[in-house]
């Protein structure tokens, strides 16, 4: 693990509940996602002296942070783990785990829809139900549904080739829509029932099966009764994806926790009765503010936001009451044209979800407090190492990133006594300089940062420059000019890479007197400097790569006659990037909205010419 991560302190905050954990490296990238029945026991196993294999050792050596999400059951954790893996694509999951996606049941968008087993990208039009825990559960379900609903399960080529009913019709497993043995209306009704069943509306189906089982038993037909019993068990196993019952529907559940000046709202997004995902939010809370007041302000901003309206549930469950709940309901309804209920007093499954959300919020606050204590200790050590008479409350760090002078970007990251203040990070697109001139880039970036320092008022106590003496001198000169008329100015410190760029061997240089010094490799003060330096590097290189890719995409397509901004955007979005556009055939290009066959030929010839 990295020097900035205190495993002992972290494990004190971890619950023994089931859940999912995400491991991050020093650049803030998710490198591993896992699930556990007992999070504390599982995460503790990573920090034993004798790790089981080289891959685990490699993973642990890169851990800089861990986030956890509690879940009601291990099955929930399994599904959520898969969602996160698909979202983040962590490199150690690819190395250590079978990354096959979970299976789905697919209902096609055909005139006579078919039911099918599906695993992989969801490209075909239709409805996808799942994900399910394993392929066997899906196949059992399809086999059961074939008996409950006479919907075809053959592929479209087989369907189109039929001139008479197949064997499935003879054994009452299909209604033979291919040859008109059922009307379109009756078939559509069967499809509707099957769709309801797949959405969890299965109580009527179960009741029907129970009735058939009891009737078979009364008729002394024990073989059929046993078959119905097995079908009911299979149906319940498939529906077991979530412990919540099917009437929970779509809702957001908001747990809240507030302690030592930190508030956290943890949202569980419940869709179709299962946990679709979760997220924690940390609002800035003025002193002496009630949790209910902060909750109201958070909900107002979150649910009236345009992005949030696209996936609004019909119900929101919250842990605290506040005065104008009904007014907020009306405001959301007006903004989204959708009726929404906010509930505070809940029982049964909703109460269970609320307990999970509250537990996640509490766990998040305790983890952040633990992290803050570590950061605070390192700030004190840094003040001592730099012999600062005043407290260090704000630090900034600049870095420059480019590729052979192309698409130069400067970053400015901010740390306070709580750690990274990501909302204050800034990037500067550098222009008007000789490509590859890092000194000129640094001069421009710092000049722009402090151009309006009097109006801004946010003066860093320490300003770190990722670079050697040359960059530091340029930065010091700019700071002297910008702060000449002020009574205060930041202390500049250059962070020069050590021999072989090995962490712990950095040379630190005071800007004013150019005195070089170093700190012990195990110094908490040095770890804090490394953290802000690495963060500025990550932020700069991410911005540079995005700018470089955008520039290359635009410049390549700009030269093609008739391809303006709208068509460039359509090509890149539809096909997924410049390389995909270059590799596309004329037929594929012509499928892009706004691209005719003639224009597709022009683009194809230009890119291949």
Curated annotation (Swiss-Prot):
GO terms for biological process: nucleotide-excision repair; SOS response. PROSITE patterns: GIY_YIG, UVR, UVRC. Residues 16-94 form the GIY-YIG domain. GO terms for cellular component: cytoplasm; excinuclease repair complex. GO terms for molecular function: DNA binding; excinuclease ABC activity. Residues 203-238 form the UVR domain. CDD domains: GIY-YIG_UvrC_Cho. It is found in: Cytoplasm. Keywords: Cytoplasm, DNA damage, DNA excision, DNA repair, Excision nuclease, SOS response. InterPro entries: GIY-YIG_endonuc (IPR000305), GIY-YIG_endonuc_sf (IPR035901), GIY-YIG_UvrC_Cho (IPR047296), Hlx-hairpin-Hlx_DNA-bd_motif (IPR003583), RuvA_2-like (IPR010994), UVR_dom (IPR001943), UVR_dom_sf (IPR036876), UvrABC_protein_C (IPR050066). It comes from the Bacteria. Gene3D superfamilies: 5' to 3' exonuclease, C-terminal subdomain, GIY-YIG endonuclease, UVR domain, UvrC, RNAse H endonuclease domain. Belongs to the UvrC family. Interacts with UvrB in an incision complex. The UvrABC repair system catalyzes the recognition and processing of DNA lesions. UvrC both incises the 5' and 3' sides of the lesion. The N-terminal half is responsible for the 3' incision and the C-terminal half is responsible for the 5' incision. NCBIfam families: PRK00558.1-5, uvrC. This is UvrABC system protein C. It comes from Shewanella loihica (strain ATCC BAA-1088 / PV-4). The gene is uvrC.
């Amino acid at each position: 693990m990295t020097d900035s991560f205190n495993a002992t302190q972290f494990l004190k905050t971890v619950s023994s509940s089931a859940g999912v954990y995400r491991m991050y490296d020093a650049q803030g990238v998710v490198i591993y996602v896992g699930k556990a029945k007992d999070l504390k026991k599982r995460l503790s196993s990573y920090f034993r002296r004798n790790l089981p294999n080289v891959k685990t050792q490699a993973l642990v050596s890169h851990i800089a942070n861990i986030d956890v999400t509690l879940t009601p059951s291990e099955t929930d954790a399994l599904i959520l783990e898969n969602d996160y893996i698909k979202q983040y694509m962590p490199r150690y999951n690819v190395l250590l785990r079978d990354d096959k996606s979970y299976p789905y049941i697919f209902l096609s968008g055909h005139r006579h829809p078919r039911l099918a087993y599906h695993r992989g990208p969801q490209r075909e039009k239709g409805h996808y139900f799942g994900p399910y825990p394993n392929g066997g559960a899906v196949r059992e379900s399809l086999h059961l549904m074939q008996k409950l609903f006479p919907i075809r399960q053959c592929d479209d080529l087989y369907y189109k080739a039929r001139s008479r009913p197949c064997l499935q019709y003879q054994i009452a497993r299909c209604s033979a829509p291919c040859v008109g043995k059922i009307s379109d209306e009756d078939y559509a009704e069967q499809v509707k029932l099957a769709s309801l069943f797949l959405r969890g509306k299965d109580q009527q189906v179960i009741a029907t099966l129970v009735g058939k089982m009891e009737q078979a038993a009364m008729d002394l037909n024990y073989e059929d009764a046993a078959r119905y019993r097995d079908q009911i068990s299979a149906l319940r196993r498939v529906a077991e994806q979530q412990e919540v019952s099917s009437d929970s529907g779509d809702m957001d559940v908001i747990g809240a926790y507030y302690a030592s000046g930190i508030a956290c709202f943890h949202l569980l997004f419940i869709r179709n009765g299962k946990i679709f995902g979760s997220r924690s939010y940390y609002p800035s809370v003025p002193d002496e503010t009630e949790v209910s007041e902060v909750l109201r302000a958070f909900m107002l901003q979150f649910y009236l936001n345009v992005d949030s309206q696209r996936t609004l549930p019909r119900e929101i469950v919250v842990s605290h009451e506040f005065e104008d709940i009904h007014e907020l309901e009306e405001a959301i309804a007006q903004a989204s044209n959708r009726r929404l209920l906010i509930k505070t007093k809940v029982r049964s499954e909703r109460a269970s979800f609320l307990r999970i959300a509250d537990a996640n919020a509490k766990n998040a606050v305790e983890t952040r407090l633990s992290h803050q204590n570590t950061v605070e200790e390192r700030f004190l050590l840094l003040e001592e190492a730099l012999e600062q008479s005043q407290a260090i409350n704000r630090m900034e760090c600049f870095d420059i990133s480019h590729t052979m002078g192309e698409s130069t970007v400067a970053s400015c990251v901010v740390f306070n006594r709580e750690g990274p203040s990501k909302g204050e990070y800034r990037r500067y697109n550098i222009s008007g300089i000789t490509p590859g001139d890092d000194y000129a880039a640094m001069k421009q970036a710092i000049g722009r940062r402090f151009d309006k320092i009097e109006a801004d008022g946010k003066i860093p106590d320490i300003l770190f420059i990722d670079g050697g003496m040359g960059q530091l001198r340029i930065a010091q000169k700019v700071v002297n000019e910008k702060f000449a008329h002020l009574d205060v100015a930041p202390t500049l410190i250059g962070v020069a890479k050590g021999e072989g760029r090995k962490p712990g061997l950095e040379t630190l240089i005071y800007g004013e007197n150019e005195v070089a010094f170093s700190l012990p490799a195990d110094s908490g003060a040095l770890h804090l400097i490394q953290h802000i330096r690495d963060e500025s590097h990550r932020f700069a290189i991410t911005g540079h790569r995005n700018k470089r890719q955008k520039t290359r995409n635009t410049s390549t397509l700009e030269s093609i006659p008739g391809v303006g901004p709208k068509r460039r955007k359509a090509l890149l979005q539809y096909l997924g990037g410049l390389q995909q556009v270059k590799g596309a055939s004329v037929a594929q290009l012509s499928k892009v909205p706004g691209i005719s066959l003639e224009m597709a030929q022009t683009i194809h010839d230009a890119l291949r010419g």
